[in-house]
């Protein structure tokens, strides 16, 4: 089962307090699990929204001397010209699309689903949103980058999400994924989707982590895009 997505445990879920009419699927960063993010969303939840925080499968990661840890795909390096795990990224995106499909089967239309993630998970959420034919409500991309950026056209994408709303957040003291990566990603996104729908927020003094103000901004973004419908 090594490296097989079926080996990952069931996601951590913050259920809706009443009938769920919208969902947030949020992907954690390298070496983490969904539990901490589920706790964070429990603190900013809205009663009609279900929050799903899946756990990545455990796999050897080249960046960390091939040690096995939860990872959505292999990471070779953190410089702009590092080789990327193309097949792993694409396979992981299919896993996320299957999670979206599952919620659609549960009665939540894809345009009432926000995809998001932190660091490696944020990178995967951006890549999935830009390549899927499932029309999504938005993406919250925290402290991350756009993977396989050379695979995208120079002009706007021809997919379901060319008008998608994106909230991208980054700390200005991030030592792992420098703020420059976030800035370059925002510029790339503005060429691929409607630039009016891309918001970039920078948090002073924040490292490769989250903060209370960022979570409030995430809550505002989610609640604005996924209002109650009953």
Curated annotation (Swiss-Prot):
The keyword Transferase does not apply. One of its GO terms (molecular function) is palmitoyl-(protein) hydrolase activity. Keywords: Acetylation, Cell membrane, Cytoplasm, Endoplasmic reticulum, Fatty acid metabolism, Hydrolase, Lipid metabolism, Membrane, Nucleus. It is found in: Cytoplasm; Cell membrane; Nucleus membrane; Endoplasmic reticulum. It catalyses: S-hexadecanoyl-L-cysteinyl-[protein] + H2O = L-cysteinyl-[protein] + hexadecanoate + H(+); 1-hexadecanoyl-sn-glycero-3-phosphocholine + H2O = sn-glycerol 3-phosphocholine + hexadecanoate + H(+); a 1-(9Z-octadecenoyl)-2-acyl-sn-glycero-3-phosphocholine + H2O = a 2-acyl-sn-glycero-3-phosphocholine + (9Z)-octadecenoate + H(+). The modification N6-acetyllysine is found at residue 224. Pfam families: Abhydrolase_2 (PF02230). The active site is at 119 (charge relay system), 174 (charge relay system), 208 (charge relay system). GO terms for cellular component: cytosol; endoplasmic reticulum; mitochondrion; nuclear membrane; nucleoplasm; plasma membrane. Changing residue 208 to A: Abolishes lysophospholipase activity. Its EC number is 3.1.2.-, 3.1.2.22. Belongs to the AB hydrolase superfamily. AB hydrolase 2 family. This is Acyl-protein thioesterase 1. It comes from Mus musculus (Mouse). The gene is Lypla1.
């Amino acid at each position: 089962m090594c490296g097989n997505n079926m080996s990952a445990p069931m996601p951590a879920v913050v259920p809706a307090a009443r009938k769920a009419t919208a969902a947030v699927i949020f992907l954690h960063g390298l070496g983490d699990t969904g539990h901490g993010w589920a706790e964070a969303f429990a603190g900013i939840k809205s009663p009609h929204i279900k929050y799903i925080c899946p756990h990545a499968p455990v796999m050897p990661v080249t960046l960390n001397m091939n040690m096995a840890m939860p990872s959505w795909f292999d990471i070779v390096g953190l410089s702009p010209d590092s080789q990327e795990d193309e097949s792993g990224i694409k396979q992981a995106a299919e896993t996320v699309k299957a999670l979206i499909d599952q919620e659609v089967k549960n009665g939540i239309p894809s345009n009432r689903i926000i995809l998001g993630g932190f660091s490696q998970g944020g990178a995967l959420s951006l890549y999935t949103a830009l390549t899927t034919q499932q029309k999504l409500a938005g993406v919250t991309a925290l402290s991350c980058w756009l993977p396989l950026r050379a695979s995208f056209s120079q002009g706007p994408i021809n997919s379901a999400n060319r008008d998608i709303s994106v909230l991208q957040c980054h700390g200005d003291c991030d030592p792992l994924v420098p703020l420059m990566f976030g800035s370059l990603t925002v510029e790339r996104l503005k060429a691929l989707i409607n630039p009016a729908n891309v918001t970039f927020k920078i948090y002073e003094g924040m490292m490769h982590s989250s903060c209370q103000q960022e979570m409030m901004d995430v809550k505002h973004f989610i609640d604005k895009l996924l209002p109650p419908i009953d």
